[in-house]
Regions:
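Extracellular, repeat-based ectodomains that mediate carbohydrate processing or recognition
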Residues: 1-139
Length: 139
């Protein structure tokens, strides 16, 4: 059973782990075929000692969310919902070069659906968005 998002890292000497979110609803990946899961695989972006953890969670209305920590050792996360609408089965992706060169976080966002057990999910064509954040102003 999966419950909460966690982050794992090695400081060069030892492995550490921290819980990022506190989900209440467990889920399992048992069964055949592709599973519609209530959370997305997170996208983790690191820069200047800060960690940005981009995710989608059904418990938060399946909107685009970001958890931010200025120090992993302290493990204090601030979670912000970046959209006020559901993106359903969306998986995070961002412009990696723009982040590396300019510390700008541009997320590709599109409402998507995922059928469970290899079933198709009916959905009309959806708009594509680029959610732009300049993390230089967040420090």
């Amino acid at each position: 059973l999966f419950r909460s998002y966690r982050i794992v890292w090695n400081d060069g000497k030892v492995w550490h782990h921290r819980q990022v979110t506190d989900r209440k609803t467990p889920f399992t990946l048992k069964g055949g075929g592709t599973k519609m899961i209530p959370i997305a695989r997170p996208r983790i972006v690191v820069g200047g000692g800060e960690v940005f953890y981009i995710f989608r969670d059904e418990e938060r209305g399946s909107c685009v969310s970001i958890a931010h920590a200025t120090d992993l050792a302290i493990s204090q996360w601030t979670i912000t919902d970046l959209t006020d609408f559901s993106v359903d089965a969306w998986e995070p992706s961002h412009d990696t070069e723009l982040w590396k060169k300019q510390r700008k976080l541009h997320l590709f966002v599109q409402h998507t659906r995922q059928g469970d057990g290899e079933r198709m999910a009916e959905i009309e064509p959806q708009m594509v968005y680029v959610l732009e954040m300049d993390m230089n102003t967040k420090k």
